[in-house]
Amino acid sequence: MPPKKKKVTGLIKLQIKAGAANPAPPVGPALGQHGVNIMEFCKAYNAATESQRGMVVPVEITVYEDRTFTFITKTPPAARLILKAAGIEKGSGEPHKTKVAKLTGAQVREIAELKMPDLNANDVDAAMKIIAGTARSMGVTVEG
C-alpha cells in the first residue's frame, strides 16, 4: 500500500532576508501559531538560502497535521532585483513624474530569465514585458 498522504493544516507565505531567518517577528509568530518548530525552520531556511545572502527571498511553508513542514523558496521579488540592477535604494515617490534610474534591455532580460519560474509568462519576451512594467511603476526607465 502506498504511504498515506499527510493532511495539510496551513500554508504560510513569508518574505525573509536570505540566511537571516530568526525566531523574532515576523517568523516566530507566523510559525508559532501553526505549532511548527521555529528553530528547525530557521536552520533549514538559512542553509537553503546561504548562497543568496543579502536578498529578500520569499518562502512558502506548508504545515502538516503532525506539525511537520516543507518549504519552497521562490526567486527574489522583481522590485528588489530591479533596485539591485539599477543600483538604487528605493523607487520613485512619483513614478510617472520623477525618474530615478535607467535599465538596459540586457538587464531586464537577465531579471526576466531569473524570475521566469515564478512568472505567469510563456516565454522570455513576455517575462521581459512584466519586468519592464514593474520597473516603470517604480520610476525606472527601460531602454530598448
UniProtKB/Swiss-Prot annotation:
The keyword DNA damage is annotated on this UniProt entry: no
Q: Which Gene3D superfamilies match?
A: Ribosomal protein L11, C-terminal domain (1.10.10.250), Ribosomal protein L11/L12, N-terminal domain (3.30.1550.10)
PROSITE patterns with a match to the protein in the record: RIBOSOMAL_L11
The protein's job, in short, is: Forms part of the ribosomal stalk which helps the ribosome interact with GTP-bound translation factors.
Species lineage = Bacteria, Bacillati, Actinomycetota, Actinomycetes, Kitasatosporales
- Any Gene Ontology biological process: translation
> What family does the Swiss-Prot or TrEMBL record give for this protein?
Belongs to the universal ribosomal protein uL11 family.
Question: Which terms does the record give in the GO molecular function aspect?
Answer: large ribosomal subunit rRNA binding; structural constituent of ribosome
Subunit annotation: Part of the ribosomal stalk of the 50S ribosomal subunit. Interacts with L10 and the large rRNA to form the base of the stalk. L10 forms an elongated spine to which L12 dimers bind in a sequential fashion forming a multimeric L10(L12)X complex.
> Domain of life here?
Bacteria
Query: Which Pfam families does this entry report, sorted A to Z?
Result: Ribosomal_L11, Ribosomal_L11_N
Keywords from the UniProt entry: Methylation, Ribonucleoprotein, Ribosomal protein, RNA-binding, rRNA-binding
The name on file for this protein is Large ribosomal subunit protein uL11
Modifications the protein undergoes after translation, according to the UniProt entry: One or more lysine residues are methylated.
